[in-house]
A protein has these predicted regions:
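Charged, often low-complexity linker/regulatory segments
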Residues: 1-123, 247-339
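Short amphipathic alpha-helical molecular recognition features
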Residues: 83, 87-91, 95, 126, ...
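Conserved catalytic cores of phosphodiester-cleaving nucleases, focusing on short active-site segments
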Residues: 95, 99-103, 134-136, 145-164
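Short amphipathic alpha-helical interaction elements and helix-loop-helix interfaces
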Residues: 105, 109, 113, 140-143, ...
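Active-site metal-binding core of divalent-cation-utilizing nuclease and nuclease-like domains
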Residues: 112-148
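Eukaryote-biased feature marking scaffold/signaling PDZ-domain proteins and nuclear chromatin regulators
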Residues: 129-131, 144-151, 172, 176-179, ...
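Short acidic, glycine/proline-enriched helix-loop-strand junctions
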Residues: 160, 202-250, 259-263
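Nucleic-acid nuclease catalytic cores
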Residues: 169-217
């Protein structure tokens, strides 16, 4: 029976799994040109019971009105079946069936998200030899099919304690993995990268202020490590993956914006990994808030669920231009005319 996606996101997979524990290392030659990840910020914690893994998503955008629309859609739980996770392909099929296929009904429209395998980046003209395993991208041609998130399948490779401690060492498999994931982020111009190895889902958000910052060794990286096996109170893979897709969408949503003046102040730039507008005050200081905001008066953004754009408000009212139209911060993300 179909149930709201919100209900399925809170449920762990219940199909039995035989996990072999076989390992695949990674040591790709092309990845050696990229710096390992050295500045990790962990956002998952182990509970007092020593078993429950909790996740804090404050480093991502909070759920908004369009999220309510998505998770209210109905979807079906996976069919009952048995699993044996032995190869990377087994891990990928499990993830598609038990996680991705549950999450994607929420993203069938507003906006439409397309999942593809082993494909080149569609939003760039550069030629690359390497293919990432998974791309989740905006499907509408109006949006240049920008990638929301990209991902890799591995096999029993992620050492969760090292990643959560923010210290994956200076050599070995974890360092090689970090080089590879940074490399894919650079090649696909996507700061949101995940890796699933059959046991853990590793989510990485490169906090790159500009696209070029992806390459920098001092670029901070938000990190979540969610286990496949968790207690009922712990974070589910489905919920974590939904939030990750939503964060990738907020980035694409924000980067569609321009420099429309807001009461005389136009955004100075956009934070690349989040899409948030950055202002510059009269002293040259960069700030996330409008330079004229005070404790009593504030300019802020609201989401238009009809077309997916952000528009500006002032003290609870719509901010209008001289023609009486909404002052928009970003472009529409759905509701385009049929081709």
């Amino acid at each position: 029976m179909a149930v709201p996606v919100s209900q399925l996101l809170r449920q762990h997979s219940t199909n039995p799994v035989q996990y072999t524990g076989l390992t695949t290392n990674t040591d790709k030659k092309w990845a050696k040109e990229f710096h390992p990840i050295t500045r990790l910020i962990g956002h998952t914690t182990l509970g007092a019971d020593g078993e429950t893994v909790y996740a804090n998503f404050d480093a991502m955008a909070p759920p908004l009105a369009d999220d309510d629309f998505r998770v209210a859609k109905h979807a079906f739980p996976p069919n009952e079946r048995r699993w044996r996770l032995e190869t990377e392909e087994d891990c990928g099929v499990w993830f598609h069936t038990e996680v991705s296929n549950i999450v994607l009904p929420a993203w069938n429209d507003r906006p439409a998200v397309l999942q593809t395998c082993q494909s080149k980046p569609a939003s760039t003209t550069k030629s690359i030899k390497e293919n990432v395993d998974m791309i989740y991208a905006l499907a509408d041609s109006h949006l240049q099919k920008r990638p929301l998130v990209i991902g890799e399948w591995k096999r029993n490779i992620i050492r969760s304690k090292a990643w959560l401690a923010g210290n994956i060492g200076t050599a070995g498999t974890q360092v090689n993995l970090s080089r590879e994931l940074r490399g894919y982020a650079v090649k696909y111009s996507c700061p949101h990268v995940f890796c699933f190895d059959g046991q853990y889902l590793l989510l990485l958000q490169f906090r790159a202020a500009t696209k070029e910052d992806l390459k920098r060794q001092d670029c901070e990286v938000d990190c979540w490590v969610i286990p496949r096996i968790n207690t009922a109170e712990g974070c589910t893979l489905r919920y974590a993956f939904y939030r990750f897709l939503a964060q990738g969408f907020r980035r694409c949503q924000g980067l569609s914006g321009g420099r429309t003046p807001v009461n005389g102040f136009a955004p100075h730039s956009r934070e690349w990994f989040s899409g948030i507008p950055i202002f510059q005050d009269e002293h040259g200081v960069l700030t996330y808030t409008h330079p004229q905001n005070t404790d009593e008066h504030a300019f802020y953004r609201e989401l238009n669920v009809e077309d997916g754009s952000f528009y500006w408000c002032y003290n609870g009212d719509y901010l209008l231009d001289l023609n009486g139209a909404l002052v928009r911060d970003t472009e529409p993300m759905w509701g385009f005319p049929e081709a």
